[in-house]
Amino acid sequence: MALAAKERKLSRLGSKGSGGGGGGGSFGARGQRAPAGTQRRLFAAFFAFLFAGAVLFGAAHVIGASFRPVLKTAWPSATLNAVSSERGAQQAGMVSVDAVLPSVHIQHAVALPDHVLLMLRDGSLLPASGQFECLYSPVNSSQLRRQPLSVATLPDGPSLVHCPAGPSRVAVSLSLAQSVPVAPLQWDRLVYTALIDSKDNSTVVFAKGMNLRPGRLGVPSRYECVFGRDFSKPKLVVTSPVVSAAQEIFRCVTPVRIRRYLRMTTGGKNSVNNDDKPMLVSIRTKGRGSSTLPSIAQPEPLPRYNKHWRRKAHSMCVCTMLRNQARFLREWIIYHSRIGVQRWFIYDNNSDDGIEEVLNTMDSSRYNVTRYLWPWMKSQEAGFAHCALRARESCEWVGFIDIDEFLHFPGNQTLQDVLRNYSVKPRIGELRTACHSFGPSGRTKIPKKGVTTGYTCRLAAPERHKSIVRPDALNPSLINVVHHFHLKEGMKYVNIGQGMMLINHYKYQVWEVFKDKFSGRVATYVADWQDEENVGSRDRAPGLGTKPVEPEDWPRRFCEVYDNGLKDFVQKVFTDPHTGNLPW
C-alpha cells in the first residue's frame, strides 16, 4: 500500500507545470453569475477594447479557448521577440557577449577535475563559443568572466559547455542564459547517466563514489535505487532493489510505475518544461548512516528488446572512446569499413579538435557512424558497458578497440570468415586477439599517408589482447577490464591465432603524437602517465618515466621486428591507380 501511494504521487509529478492546472476554471465560475444586462455591458466594453487595439496596432488576434478565454496581444511578446532575434542573430553571427537568449537553460553543472561542465536542456540554441562567456559568482566581479574552453552539441541531445575551473564553491552560469547560476556538483560523488533495459525490466545506473573494486562483484544488498524528482522528499520517491553492483555500474529493478511514466512521456524521453524538475535515478546505501548520491541521471530507454528477431542488422560493429584523435579518424573508419565493419559507436571524451567536421566530410550512406558525447573523465569501462547495451539490438558482434588499433588478417581469411566460424557456436561469447605494438619506426614527423603505411617496426612479443564480443553473451554486471568483458555463466571465450587475426597497435608513434598521452588516460583503474604509481606497468612506455620529455633515441625505440604485412595490404587495396593517393 505504501509503495502504491508513492507511485500515485510519482505519477502526479508528470503533470506538474502543465497547462490547465492551478487556479484555472471557467470564466466567471467563482461566485454568482452577474445579471444578463451587466454581462452584455461587460462584453461590449471588452470587444470595444479589442477594436481599439486593432486600430492602434494595425492587427488583432481573436483567440478562443475552452472554459476560459485567452487573450494574445497583436504584437509578439518580449520573449518571442527575443527568440526570433536570437535565431536571426545566431545565423548572422552577431550575438553580443552580454545578450540573454531565452532558449538557453542550464540543467546541470558538474565540477570535473580540470574544468566545469555545463549541461543545457534539449533545445538550447548556442552561438559560437567566442560569443558568450562563463560567469562565476559573484557575477559583479570582472575577474570572474572567462571564455568557455569548448562547446559540443548534437542534433538529438543536450549541448555541453566546458568552462574553465573557477574558484571553489561558486555557482556558474553563462552570459547568455536566463536561468540562475548553478552550483556545480562534485564529480567524485555523482550518478551521471542511466539506461532502462526492457530485456529484463532493469535500470542500469552509472555512478562515481561507491569505490567498488575493479573486476569484482560488489554486494548488491548494500544498495538500492531511488527514483524521483526530489530525493529530499521521501514520500515522493520510489525505491527498488539493486540486483548487481560492480565497478561503477549498478543494475536494479525498474518499478512498474516508472516504466509507465517513461512510456507516457514524448518518445519515451524524460522531458521537462522550464519550471519542472526532471525524473532522476540515484543510488542509496542501506543501513545505518545511509546516503543518496547526488544525481543528474535521467533514465534513458534503450531500443526495445525483441527476442523474436533472429538476425540483427549488422554482423560487426565497433565501439571506441577517444579524445582529440580527429586527424586519424578517416583512416581508421575507411580501413575498417573495407574489411567488414558495418557500424561505429564513437564515444567522444571532450574532444576539441574538430571531430564533427571530420565526420561531416564522410559519406553517411557508406559509413554508419554514431558520435556520442561522453564527457565523463576516467570512465572508459563504464562507457564500454554503456556502448555494449546500445549496440546490443543491432549488432551481432562488437569490437572494443582504440583509434590507433587496426584489425589485421595475415592469412587468407577475412573478418567475415572469422565471425561466421564462431557465430554457429552459441556458447562462444568473446573472441580475443593478440596485439602487436609498433614504434616510431625511425620517424620524427607524422607520416602523411597514415599510420598503417607509416609505421612498420614493432616489438617482437605481442602484448595484451583486445576483444570482439557478442553483446547478448555479456554478464549482467557488465564488468569489463582492459577491453574484455565478463561473460554469462556457460559462455566461453576463444583465443584467435595470430596467423588468423591480430591487431596492429600503433602505440608508440612519433613524439608529436605520443606526448598527448600525458594529458590523461580515459580508463578508470589505469594511472595517468604523469602519476608516480604503477610506473612499471605494461600500460606505460618502458623506460619513459612520468615526464613528457622526448628521449633522444625516441625514433629508434620499440623496434625489434620489421613488419610490412598491413602496409602491403593497404597499398594494394586502397591506392588510387590514377593518383597513387590513399583515400584518407
UniProtKB/Swiss-Prot annotation:
Domain named GT92: residues: 314-525
Protein name, as recorded: Glycosyltransferase family 92 protein Os08g0121900
Keyword Membrane: yes
Record's subcellular location: Membrane
Keyword set includes Ribosomal protein: no
Source species taxonomy: Eukaryota, Viridiplantae, Streptophyta, Embryophyta, Tracheophyta
Region annotation Disordered: where it falls in the sequence: 1-33
Source species, domain of life: Eukaryota
Record Pfam families: Glyco_transf_92 (PF01697)
One GO CC annotation: cytoplasm
Keywords noted in UniProt: Glycosyltransferase, Membrane, Transferase, Transmembrane, Transmembrane helix
Compositionally biased region (Gly residues): 16-28
Disulfide bonding pattern of the chain: none
Biological source species: Oryza sativa subsp. japonica
Family membership: Belongs to the glycosyltransferase 92 family.
